A protein has these predicted regions:
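Transmembrane beta-barrel domains of outer membrane proteins
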Residues: 35, 56-58, 135-139, 171-175, ...
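Short, glycine-/polar-rich solvent-exposed loops and beta-turns at beta-strand/coil boundaries
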Residues: 24-27, 44-49, 125, 162-164, ...
């Protein structure tokens, strides 16, 4: 056991110690080197106890100005969904349980319910992933430069309206030979991240747990006037769909399992964002 050190390695990006490299555009990375020997601890201290990873970003080179672009587009989907009961099957099983317990059948006509609500189909969606990177570099025997701009956008496969990640990066690295014995330069990086995630275990559950546990006999939106007048919907703060009808509430499942569509409405606009500037200015003197 070590004190003063975490489980993560120490990241050194262009000579700067950082907690992680989430702010970096992968296209800007020139090389990565892992240091595992004891010498790293003598250089970087106790924070290097778990190892050191040196990251060097791209620099400009002498020659003509070079312009490059790299991009891709892809779509992701859930690899597999659980094979759950439909509404008719669920109703038959619920009736059997009640009858075996000495009660009356809860559903008078299970076959009439059909497939019912597929909660997994409601929350899972195709998720697009887009990346665009453009860079320019060049220089002469006196100065070199490398500049880049990156855009990355990824939707979540679960309710993409409230699960997504967007990152914009900009970088400028340059080096200037002021005198034959003196070179100065800088590495500057700006990153803007805007993201939205889904709580998997909140006070009222989450879309994933609800999609698995909610019964298929409950509709996404309740349209039955008789049920809307019941005590379950007798709440002025209950969430309603754009048409005015309330989102379906299950009378069979623990109420901590919220309607995923109602949950989605409470999370719209709930974003996290950050703006990070990382850089350094250096001078190299040859004696």
């Amino acid at each position: 056991t070590s004190f003063g050190a975490g489980n993560d390695p120490l990241w050194i990006v262009d000579g700067i110690a950082v907690d992680n490299i989430g702010f970096l555009n992968q296209s800007d990375i020139e090389s990565m080197e892992i240091l595992k020997d004891g010498a790293s601890a003598s250089i970087y201290g106790v924070s290097a106890a778990r190892g050191v990873i040196l990251v060097t970003t791209k620099k400009g080179k002498q020659g003509k100005i070079s312009l490059s672009y790299n991009g891709f587009y892809g779509v992701g989907n859930a690899a597999k969904k659980l094979d759950l009961l439909n509404a008719s099957q669920y109703a038959m099983l619920a009736n059997e349980k009640r009858i075996n317990g000495g009660g009356n059948a809860y559903f008078p006509n299970p076959d009439a319910l059909g497939a019912g609500t597929d909660w997994q189909k409601l929350i899972f969606n195709s998720a697009a992933r887009t990346s665009h990177d453009i860079s320019v570099s060049g220089g002469n025997d006196k100065s070199t430069f490398f500049g880049s701009f990156g855009y990355y956008n990824q939707e979540g496969i679960v309710m993409r309206d409230i699960s997504n990640y967007k990152r914009i990066t900009a970088r400028l690295n340059s080096s200037h030979k002021v005198f034959p014995f003196l070179t100065v330069g800088q590495t500057l990086n700006y990153t803007h991240v805007k993201s939205q995630g889904i709580n998997s275990n909140g006070e009222f559950g989450g879309p994933l747990s609800s999609a698995i546990n909610l019964d298929p006999t409950t509709p996404i939106i309740e349209t039955d006037p008789a049920k809307i007048k019941s005590s379950a919907y007798n709440n002025p703060y209950i969430l309603r769909a754009p048409g005015g009808n309330p989102y379906g509430i299950s009378s069979l499942v623990n109420q901590e399992m919220s309607n995923p569509l109602a949950f989605q409405q409470t999370q719209l606009g709930n974003y996290n964002w950050s703006d990070d500037f990382v850089g350094n200015v250096y001078a190299e003197l040859k004696l």
